[in-house]
UniProtKB/Swiss-Prot annotation:
Highest taxon listed in the record's lineage: Bacteria
Organism per entry: Streptomyces griseus subsp. griseus (strain JCM 4626 / CBS 651.72 / NBRC 13350 / KCC S-0626 / ISP 5235)
Protein's name according to its UniProt entry: 4-hydroxy-tetrahydrodipicolinate reductase
Catalysis: reaction(s): (S)-2,3,4,5-tetrahydrodipicolinate + NAD(+) + H2O = (2S,4S)-4-hydroxy-2,3,4,5-tetrahydrodipicolinate + NADH + H(+); (S)-2,3,4,5-tetrahydrodipicolinate + NADP(+) + H2O = (2S,4S)-4-hydroxy-2,3,4,5-tetrahydrodipicolinate + NADPH + H(+)
Keywords: Amino-acid biosynthesis, Cytoplasm, Diaminopimelate biosynthesis, Lysine biosynthesis, NAD, NADP, Oxidoreductase
GO molecular function: 4-hydroxy-tetrahydrodipicolinate reductase; NAD binding; NADP binding; oxidoreductase activity, acting on CH or CH2 groups, NAD or NADP as acceptor
Active site: 135 (proton donor/acceptor), 139 (proton donor)
């Protein structure tokens, strides 16, 4: 059986370089291009890439995906900064390339994805819930895409269950003291030297609390999810948001 031809965009970054090694080590994949800033996107078509792993920046991702979709190249995207407007534009491009698949994953760690699903399942049973994400100080966005996605899943689960608004008697606070409000769920971001990527979901009810925590200790923790995404996206046309849809959790 022929190998799937894969390219990595953002190949010189920490996660990108790890992804290059992971693709090279996979028996069923062939690394055909490893592109960094300034490299020609035409290399993707020159090398016959069938799928890309997109790990660049919010400033570059739309141009890269536009090129990929115009040439029928599937994409697994870890780049953050997604807005409703950007997603709408991406769906417009996908309408013109209906057989092409795009996976956008706020987190490629399977443990982190499971943490999100556990929190979603638990949220309806507790009166209060808050999210704390902890990352290295070089991370440019806050809160993280994972924390935002977690809060959105929690909020949707609570709305479906008819949960009351969370109790909070705070009337005065310094700016940011109660975190960011994501659909009614407080999200707190910590940036600290020595950390990589960590998240806690704190749930509280009458006389008890539950803490759901995940820790990524090395960039290698993202590789099984990236490889799963590459293998599944080529048979999943359209936009898939969240790696959980490829884990058959339901």
């Amino acid at each position: 059986m022929s190998k799937l031809r894969v390219a990595v965009l953002g190949a010189r970054g920490r996660i990108g370089s790890e992804a290059v090694r992971a693709v090279e080590a996979a028996d069923d994949l062939e690394l055909v291009a490893a592109l960094g800033r300034g490299d020609r996107l035409e290399t993707l078509t020159d090398t016959g890439a069938q799928a890309v792993v997109e790990l660049t920046t919010p400033a570059s991702v739309m141009e890269n995906l536009d090129f990929c979709l115009r040439h029928g190249i599937h994409a697994v995207v870890g780049t953050t900064g997604w807005t409703d407007e950007r997603l709408a534009q991406l769906n417009t491009w996908l309408d013109d390339s209906p057989s092409t698949g795009v996976l956008i994953a706020p987190n490629f760690s399977i443990g982190a994805v499971l943490t999100m699903k556990f929190a979603e399942r638990a949220a309806r049973y507790f009166e209060s819930v808050e999210v704390v994400e902890l990352h290295h100080p070089n991370k440019v966005d806050a809160p993280s895409g994972t924390a935002t996605r977690t809060a959105q899943l929690i909020a949707a689960a609570r709305a479906e269950a008819g949960s009351a608004p969370q109790p909070d008697a705070t009337t005065t606070a310094l700016d940011g003291a109660r975190g960011a409000d994501v659909d009614g769920v407080p999200v707190h971001a910590i940036r600290l030297r020595g950390l990589l990527a960590h998240q806690e979901v704190l749930l509280g009810g009458e006389g008890e609390t539950l803490t759901i925590r995940h820790d990524s200790l090395h960039h290698s923790s993202f590789m099984p999810g990236i490889l799963l995404g590459v293998r599944r996206v080529v048979t999943t046309p359209g936009l898939t948001f969240g790696l959980e849809h490829f884990l058959d959790l339901n």
